[in-house]
């Protein structure tokens, strides 16, 4: 698998490793980018993989809540210019409300749902593409709900009410007063936006991610030259640290830098006089996991003008 200079540049940005180390890692991995990342980490030449995925895609994330339920929706566009368009923003807002009210389980179900202005959500999307002149697509949707309690929304760097680039929902199960839950939910949502947890608890973490971290830790331990039993403890310790840092309830609260999120929730429940359970959460970051194709603007202009 061949690789390009852009791959080397991206690998340097992703890992912080030197250029020659990045080239060597890509050579050894046959151009496999993720394998090169793992190889650099195993050799101690890269910091832990950044949790933020490449987020070059444009568009908006929308959130909507109604008491004990909430939904997050991501709608992509080709440029940030369209994301600032009133027509596009109105569509994302209304489509998110439709998703909430119809409990659409996925993007296809949402497309088939009735749109407030007539027709279906898919019809309105098609009309938007035609009138705005840029491709747009519904990318993903997720619901959260509690039987008794509240779902709290938060939008980081909001472009408009409940629209922006990072949308968060926090589902709190409790009989505590709504204002207490609202305040707690807002704080936790801000933490989630900043800390990027990968799961609610360590047990909820993707098994493939854990296996990947264990493999990297084992390679690092093997290079230490220490006895097998010591290496095993090193690996277990590294995996446990990874799980603790990436599971929401065990993360250290960014606002006090000492309490875990679970401790923050427990303390809030004690103060409110009712047990509070952080049941679920959603964190949608615009374009997460999507890499936008980079183009050479000068080359595009030359091509359009017929210049070789």
Swiss-Prot record:
Similarity field: Belongs to the EF-Ts family.
Family matches, as InterPro entries: EF-Ts_dimer_sf, Transl_elong_EFTs/EF1B, Transl_elong_EFTs/EF1B_dimer, Transl_elong_Ts_CS, UBA-like_sf
Entry protein name: Elongation factor Ts
Gene name tied to this protein: tsf
Any one cellular-component term (Gene Ontology): cytoplasm
Any matching Pfam family: EF_TS
Its biological purpose: Associates with the EF-Tu.GDP complex and induces the exchange of GDP to GTP. It remains bound to the aminoacyl-tRNA.EF-Tu.GTP complex up to the GTP hydrolysis stage on the ribosome.
Record key words, sorted: Cytoplasm, Elongation factor, Protein biosynthesis
Sequence segments annotated as region (Involved in Mg(2+) ion dislocation from EF-Tu): 79-82
Gene Ontology MF terms: translation elongation factor activity
Organism of this sequence: Novosphingobium aromaticivorans (strain ATCC 700278 / DSM 12444 / CCUG 56034 / CIP 105152 / NBRC 16084 / F199)
Intracellular or extracellular location(s): Cytoplasm
